[in-house]
Amino acid sequence: MDEVVVLAVAFFGAALLYASVGHAGASGYLAAMGLLGVAPATMKPTALALNILVASIVTVRFGLAGHVRWRALLPFLVGSIPMAFVGGALVLPGALYRPLVGIVLFIAAVRLFQTARAAGAAEGRETAIPAIPAVIAGAGIGLLSGLTGTGGGIFLTPLILSAGWAPARVAAGISAAFILANSIAGLLGNVASIGSFPAALPVWLIAVAIGGSLGAELGARRLGTPALRRALALVLVVAGLKLVFLG
């Protein structure tokens, strides 16, 4: 099967599944491209472009459902946007980029397992988000997002849930808007990478738009199940192993 079609199907599935838990799918897109040996120069801008579209869809859907708390989001963005821009401007050689993305995928897999356990527990408690820790956390996540081509939601959601700062759907809504801002900042940080967009990008954008719309509709009503998150984590582990050890 043609690589463009294979990736379109993979991206559709990633967008559907990730949008159902309030994310945009960057780690899934990177995993698919990594498994098929796509060049790092193409992986990063492609993942960010797909992320921007899906995160926009998810943010609107979760926002309309009342799950995005903009004031709670603000301190995270104060730290993350400039650092995502800086990270996006840094172009790592393939020998460093692939292992780094592989490690990020491993961490993302662990976080997915954690959210599978934490989502239910977090519903019963909620505390105010402290501004300074939120800015610091946002800065660290933003830099990593810009460097790798992810949106950072896979790190922010578990943090919010484990700290008891918001219930699961609100955590997902905050993360969706956070992902959107970081993805835009990361892509703007390396405008030159826009020239590395593959010719198949319009096809993939259509695929993720459909998948993301279906997933966002599902997620705004019923978040992805723990079993689904564990399955996604397994895929990320396989892709991470490939990137770290095989390049």
What do the predicted segments below correspond to?
Residues 1-15, 19, 24, 28-36, ...:
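Juxtamembrane transmembrane-helix boundary motif
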Residues 30, 156-157:
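Interfacial helix-capping/hinge residues at the ends of transmembrane alpha-helices
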Residues 40-45, 172-176:
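Small-residue hotspots at the loop-to-helix junctions and early N-terminal turns
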Residues 46-61:
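Transmembrane alpha-helices of multi-pass small-molecule transport proteins
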Residues 47-51, 175-179, 201-205:
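Short hydrophobic/aromatic, small-residue-rich stretches within specific transmembrane helices
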Residues 170-186:
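Hydrophobic alpha-helical transmembrane segments of multi-pass integral membrane proteins
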Residues 186-192:
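Membrane-helix boundary/interface segments in integral membrane proteins
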